[in-house]
C-alpha cells in the first residue's frame, strides 16, 4: 500500500513475486486471481508485501526514491547473522536509542529449538550471555527495560550475572505459568518459568495491565465511585475534600463541582440544576452523607474511568468507576500465557511445518513488551535471539490493536530465518488470523521491514576458494616445507581473492 501505482504493472508481471505470494498468502485461491496477475488484483489486495529481492537493482532504487523518509517509514529491521555481530554492527546507528530489549535465550536444557548448542556447561552459558548482555547495554536509552526469559536451570546464574554486570538497576523476577500441565521432573513438576525485568532503580518504568481485554481472565473492577466501606472511614467528615457534586447531562458526566461547604447538606443523592443538569452527591442508600473515593483535586485524573448509571428502580443516578488498568502481579498465571495453547498452536496455524516446538505464547511476549515500554505506543524493541519471530509478531499485534508505532529489530543466525522468521512476519502483516497456513481474512496493516545478512569470520573461512598448481601440491608432501608454506603463502596468496579484499572496495556495491 506504500508503493506508487506506477510500479504495479512491473509487480504484476514478476513471476518470482507471484510464486512467493502463493506460498505465503495462497493468493491462487482468491476469486480474482489470474496468471499473470493484474493491476486491479494488486489494487484489491493492498497489503501484499513485495520483496525487492525479486526485482532489478535499478528498479529497486527507483522505487525507494519515491518513498519519503524511508527510515521513518520502516517498521522493522531483521538480521540473518550471529547476534553478537549484529549488536556491534548496529551500535553506530542505535547507540542509546533502544527503549527495550527482550530476549529468550537458550535455557541450557536438553531440548530446545534454538540453534546454539543446548548442553552448555554453566560457565559456557554464562559466557555466551555475558558477552551479549554487556555489549547490548550501549544500545539502551537512560530510561530502559531489559527483559530476559529463563527457566530454573540457569535462573540463579542469570541473576548473579545481572548483579555483577549492571549497577544502579532493579531486577524484578516474574514467574510465568507457561506449562499448566507441568513438566516431568524427579521431585516437582515445573509449571512456570521466569522473566527478569531489569530497569534503572528509583523510577516508574513498568506499564499497567489492561483488564479490558476480553481474552484475559482477570476482569475490570467495577464499583461505585462512592466509598462503600463500613464505619467512620466512609463518612463525609473523614475527608471533607471528597464531598462535592458531579454534574451529568443526558446521561454523561460533564463537570465536577467544588468541594461543598461544611454547613451545606443536600436533600438527596440527586439534585436538579439548570438546563437539564443533574448534580450527583456521594450519599449512601440510607441517606447518610458519604464521600467519593477521590478528592476533588485528583478525580479528574480518572475521568475516562467514570460513567453515569441510572437505577430505574430507585429513580436516581449514581457515578460508577470502571478500573481497567492494574499493576502487573509478580505471578502471571492467566491461561493466555500457555506456551502450548498460545505459542505452538498459534505458530502452527500460521506455519504448519515449522520446526519450532516450544515457542513463547504470543501474549507472554506482547505483555512483556507492553509492560516494558510502560504502555507507550512507540519505542524500539530489540530481540537478538529472535527464533520464530514471536517478538516481531507481538509488536505487530500491539500496533494493530492501538495504531501504535513500535519498531522491532531482530537478529537470528539460524537457517530457518528464510523459512520461519521472515515469512512469519510477512504473513501476520497480511492477516491477523490463520488456519492451516492460510489467511482467514485480509485485515492487513501497512508495514515495511528491511532485512540484511551479515557475513561472519567463520562464513568467510567457509567460502575460501584455493587455487594450487601441481608443483605447489608436491611441496606439501615435505612436512617442514608444508608448515612454512601454510603460514606464509597460502593465506596471503592462494586465498587472497576469497578473503576480504580491500582492493575490491573501489566498487563496494560490486564486491
Regions found by a protein language model. Give the residues of each.
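Accessory, often C-terminal, charged low-complexity segments
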Residues: 1-57, 75, 91, 95, ...
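Mobile active-site "lid"/loop adjacent to the S-adenosyl-L-methionine
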Residues: 99, 105-128, 141-144, 153-154
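Small/polar loops that bind or transfer phosphate-bearing groups
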Residues: 79, 149-150, 383, 412
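Conserved P-loop NTPase mechanochemical-coupling segment
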Residues: 62-78
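Conserved SAM-binding loop and adjacent beta-strand
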Residues: 350-363
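Conserved proline-anchored active-site loop of SAM-dependent methyltransferases
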Residues: 96-111, 381-395
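Short amphipathic alpha-helices and their capping/turn segments at secondary-structure boundaries
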Residues: 83-100
